[in-house]
């Protein structure tokens, strides 16, 4: 089984552009609606794939601000320092500076343009590191 997070944005096209510039995602597929909004896209970072689209009535309400969301996305990256600098240069709202953790990871956190909380670090879950 695989888990593929799905994120819906008010401006999915803008979000995709930001995720590419700030966090290094690569767009694998993109399908637009007749009105030009993004119906479905697939973005990859390393071995991980997430799906991004435009929020639509009946599908999922897109909040005005994700700052109160109780979920975030954590991605392990190889060159965390370079990733952090790239995110900062692209205008990501860094909410937690680079830091070492007591569980052996180095991490930082940032929000994208619509407030989705992203976490990046060197931690690899134990089940995956075996």
Protein language model annotation of sequence segments:
Residues 9-13:
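Short acidic-aromatic low-complexity motifs
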């Amino acid at each position: 089984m695989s888990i593929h997070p799905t994120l819906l944005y008010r401006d999915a096209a803008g979000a995709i552009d930001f995720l590419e510039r700030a966090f290094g995602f690569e767009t694998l597929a993109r399908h637009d609606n007749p009105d030009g909004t993004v119906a479905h896209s697939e973005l990859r970072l390393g071995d991980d794939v997430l799906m991004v689209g435009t929020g639509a009535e009946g599908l999922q309400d897109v909040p005005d601000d994700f700052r109160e969301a109780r979920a975030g996305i954590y991605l392990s990256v190889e060159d965390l320092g370079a990733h952090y600098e790239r995110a900062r240069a692209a205008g990501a709202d860094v909410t937690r500076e680079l830091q070492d953790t007591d569980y052996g990871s180095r991490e930082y956190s940032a929000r994208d343009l619509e407030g989705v909380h992203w976490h990046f670090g060197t931690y690899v879950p134990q089940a995956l590191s075996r």
